[in-house]
Amino acid sequence: MTNADPHELQKFSDLAHRWWDPNAEFKPLHDLNPVRLGWIDAHAHLAGKRALDIGCGGGILSESMAGLGAQVKGIDLSTEALGVADLHSLESGITVDYEAIAAEAIAAREPGTYDVVTCMEMLEHVPSPGDIVAACATLVKPGGWVFFSTLNRNLKAYLFAVIGAEYIAQMLPKGTHDYARFIRPSELAGFVRATDLHIVEIKGITYHPIGKRFALSNDTDINYLVACRRGA
């Protein structure tokens, strides 16, 4: 059985044509991307590395990693989003190899293949996030890096990420997130400990409404990032 929720896939497929519009529904991803890209590159030094972007959607992170010199493959189960990603890659001239395949399936096919594996803003949208973490651990080379980002599960995250972002500020379409699927850092750490990955750093992401920008912080109450390495 595929580790995906058909409703979640359809939700993002319906918006696929808007993926690269920086002022539409995916504006938060465009605004967030420089922060997460810089953080990933600071750890993994992307130039010349082979990278896999799991749950790549329309390719915002995939293209930006390729732009820094990585050889990037992006995977997703939304063929609509991948179609948009392919088209944008042609328009930008930045080469990314996209494929419609599940994380678990590519892990079985290509174990220990990638220097860098990213899984950003995806874990909270799948039924079994622990299985995705395990697939990431299988895919990365010994000594390689795996990066996750997701949403904490607490009252503050619900108020800001759901009520605030979706209903008040309308930064995201209503129904983008299911609070019950948010993941506490301790839970994600548990998934990681079940593999041969170890956590190197956990950082929060804070949104500054006055400047309308995201920044790294030590506040993991809402959005947070986790950098992991596989044992050599």
Curated annotation (Swiss-Prot):
GO terms for molecular function: 2-polyprenyl-6-hydroxyphenol methylase activity; 3-demethylubiquinol 3-O-methyltransferase activity; polyprenyldihydroxybenzoate methyltransferase activity. Pathway: Cofactor biosynthesis; ubiquinone biosynthesis. Keywords: Methyltransferase, S-adenosyl-L-methionine, Transferase, Ubiquinone biosynthesis. The keyword S-adenosyl-L-methionine applies. It is an enzyme of class 2 (transferase). S-adenosyl-L-methionine binds at residues 36, 55, 76, 120. It catalyses: a 3-demethylubiquinol + S-adenosyl-L-methionine = a ubiquinol + S-adenosyl-L-homocysteine + H(+); a 3-(all-trans-polyprenyl)benzene-1,2-diol + S-adenosyl-L-methionine = a 2-methoxy-6-(all-trans-polyprenyl)phenol + S-adenosyl-L-homocysteine + H(+). O-methyltransferase that catalyzes the 2 O-methylation steps in the ubiquinone biosynthetic pathway. Belongs to the methyltransferase superfamily. UbiG/COQ3 family. This is Ubiquinone biosynthesis O-methyltransferase. It comes from Burkholderia lata (strain ATCC 17760 / DSM 23089 / LMG 22485 / NCIMB 9086 / R18194 / 383). The gene is ubiG.
